[in-house]
């Protein structure tokens, strides 16, 4: 093994298998958190939605020192929707830590990222975590890991991986299969990483080539570029060439160079081949650009990511409530925010439409687009979006659409729920794998457009116990029309404040999306009709006052709880003539045309 003073390693794990707990323990074991400091749980999951959704969205890095070797840890998203982040994370590293739960075994998210790592010929250290669980089945899980590598056509050298057993929450590890004792720490894991993961290749004395894989921003330094030095040495104060995507090259002096230390960044004088860097002072730099030798610039191959399969429109909010709940409401502000997203997210694309106030946004999947919308909403943006549509293409004159594999992990008693959910969506069950933990993995192949909303549906039907992983599986001839919702829309025909009296009458006609005392406007969808046609209604209708006392039953209005329209549910529910209004405080469904007569056409 090379005596290089650092290792670059990516972390691959499924939801709740202990990835962030393990990183916390490694930071503590190597002194990043001192004994008197309060530790911050889930340090790498710094994005609010990552903590809430239990997924990793952004690829982040931390660095620890272990016995003279710096280990750069790069987190990887586990979902195919964030494939752009996965590719960029793996471009930074020379090996992976594959973290597996000792009871649950390999899971869908694990398979996707591991397949990408094996395609890059990255060696793995397999970590079996939570080996102290009462339901741990360590030997069986190890066998399942080997089966996973075989299924992914791993080469012999990749299958000969070391195994480390850990109890991350207690900071214990041992090599091989077993349960670490009370006298152990994480030394076995850290030593295995240093001994197994190859040191970075590249000659520090060679011609400079450094690949930009991510972007960040600083209030003081402006745009920051994050990446890896592939060849040569990046030195602060030297002239470097910036090689752009359009083939142009510009030269300037590197004034601000940083490296990773613990959870932060520190100023450094240089970064040698194989190390990770952060640079400032290049306001036009983009992901995939190369920082090269000023005299002999040689650009590196640009990063490639999977093509978008879904598109939708983002536009200025045109409802009567526009501007009352958000801070950023103009088309210029929305466009600037989306352009910033594209700069830092290579798997998102934006395009023009026939209206300057409406922008088309394409992404890898429904989850990725929903995360973008939710991020903007929390930042104070107010806008309206259309239903996601698949991107189609012609193959030899035949219309083709994207097809996905949905790998659904559910308790055994909910397998029937899955089959009932996918049957009307033209999905085909291609595999059914009962596990030893009372759960079954159902693999479904279906058109991408038919899977919109499936995650929310299954989460509701299984009371939050379903795990759904979707990944692109190619293209297939157009599958024809798919069934949408059966009921029409209940559409408010005027503005006002909803009343219990009006809603009591309307709830007999369908399912309500609003409660009493809410602001409504003409063209706003306030519920789903039990019949197929749209129904105009007045949810603000007051009860006529008389001097005649009514029966007590008339006084006691019992409203059923309204259906809460989350962002994902709303995106699935709406049709082509409807939009979702998104503000920092509300998610509303509305008709595209708000005049009462046209809105209910």
Regions found by a protein language model. Give the residues of each.
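Conserved nucleotide-binding/hydrolysis modules and their immediate coupling elements
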Residues: 209-312, 322-324, 487, 494-546, ...
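A short, contiguous, amphipathic alpha-helix enriched in charged residues
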Residues: 319-342, 560-562
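P-loop NTPase switch module centered on the Walker A-proximal segment
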Residues: 1-100, 104, 140, 144, ...
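Residue-level signature of catalytic and energy-coupling elements of molecular machines
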Residues: 16, 22, 54, 73-75, ...
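Interdomain boundary/hinge elements
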Residues: 39-44, 152-164, 200-211, 246-260, ...
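Acidic, low-complexity intrinsically disordered tails
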Residues: 586-601
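Canonical P-loop GTPase G-domain recognition
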Residues: 123, 133-195
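Conserved structured catalytic cores and adjacent interaction surfaces
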Residues: 4-10, 15-18, 80, 103-115, ...
């Amino acid at each position: 093994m090379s005596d290089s003073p650092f290792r670059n390693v990516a972390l691959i794990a499924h939801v709740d298998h202990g990835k962030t707990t393990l990183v916390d323990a490694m930071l503590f074991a190597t002194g990043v958190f001192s004994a008197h400091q309060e530790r911050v749980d889930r340090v790498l999951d710094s994005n609010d939605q990552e903590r809430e959704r239990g997924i990793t969205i952004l690829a982040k890095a931390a660095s620890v020192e272990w016995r003279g070797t710096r280990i750069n840890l790069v987190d990887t998203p586990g979902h195919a929707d964030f494939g752009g982040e996965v590719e960029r994370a793996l471009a930074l590293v020379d090996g992976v830590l594959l973290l597996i739960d000792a009871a649950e075994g390999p899971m869908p998210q694990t398979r996707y990222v591991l397949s990408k790592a094996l395609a890059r010929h990255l060696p793995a250290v397999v970590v079996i975590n939570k080996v102290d669980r009462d339901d741990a089945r360590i030997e069986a899980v190890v066998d399942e890991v080997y089966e996973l590598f075989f299924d992914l056509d791993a080469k012999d050298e990749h299958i000969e991986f070391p195994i480390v057993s850990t109890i991350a929450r207690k900071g214990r590890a041992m090599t091989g299969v077993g349960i670490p004792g009370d006298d152990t720490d994480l030394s076995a894991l850290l030593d295995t990483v240093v001994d197994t993961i190859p040191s970075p290749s590249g000659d520090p004395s060679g011609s400079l080539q450094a690949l930009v894989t991510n972007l960040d921003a600083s209030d003081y330094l402006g745009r920051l570029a994050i990446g890896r030095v592939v060849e040569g040495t990046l030195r602060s104060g030297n002239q470097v060439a910036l090689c752009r995507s359009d083939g142009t090259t510009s030269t300037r002096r590197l004034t601000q160079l940083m490296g990773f230390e613990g959870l932060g960044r520190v100023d450094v004088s240089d970064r040698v081949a194989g190390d990770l860097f952060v640079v400032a002072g290049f306001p036009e730099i983009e992901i995939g650009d190369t920082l090269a030798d000023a005299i002999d610039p040689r650009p590196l191959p640009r990063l490639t990511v999977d093509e978008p399969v879904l598109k939708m429109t983002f536009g200025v909010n045109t409802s009567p409530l526009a501007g009352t709940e958000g801070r950023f409401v103009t088309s210029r502000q929305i466009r600037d925010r989306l352009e910033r997203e594209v700069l830092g997210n290579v798997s998102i694309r934006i395009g023009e439409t026939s209206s300057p106030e409406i922008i088309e946004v394409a992404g890898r999947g429904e989850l990725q687009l929903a995360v973008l919308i939710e991020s903007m909403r929390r930042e104070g943006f107010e806008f309206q979006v259309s239903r996601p549509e698949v991107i189609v293409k012609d193959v030899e004159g035949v219309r083709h659409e994207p097809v996905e594999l949905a790998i659904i992990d559910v308790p055994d008693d909910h397998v029937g729920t899955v089959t009932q959910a996918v049957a009307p969506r033209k999905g085909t069950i291609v595999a059914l794998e009962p596990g030893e933990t009372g759960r079954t993995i159902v693999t479904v192949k279906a058109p991408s457009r038919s899977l919109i909303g499936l995650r929310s549906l299954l989460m509701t039907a299984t009371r939050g116990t379903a795990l759904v992983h979707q990944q692109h599986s190619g293209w297939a001839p157009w599958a024809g029309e798919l069934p949408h919702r059966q009921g029409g829309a209940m559409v408010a025909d005027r503005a006002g404040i909803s009343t219990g009296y009006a809603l009591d009458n309307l709830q007999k006609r369908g399912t309500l999306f609003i409660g009493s005392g809410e602001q409504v406007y003409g063209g706003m969808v306030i519920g789903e009709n039990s019949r197929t046609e749209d129904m105009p209604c007045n949810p603000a209708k007051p009860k006529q006052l008389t001097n005649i006392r009514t029966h007590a039953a008339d006084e006691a209005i019992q409203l059923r709880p309204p259906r809460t329209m989350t962002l994902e549910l709303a995106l699935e529910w709406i049709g082509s003539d409807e939009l979702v209004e998104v503000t920092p405080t509300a998610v509303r469904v509305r008709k595209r045309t708000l005049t009462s007569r046209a809105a209910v056409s």
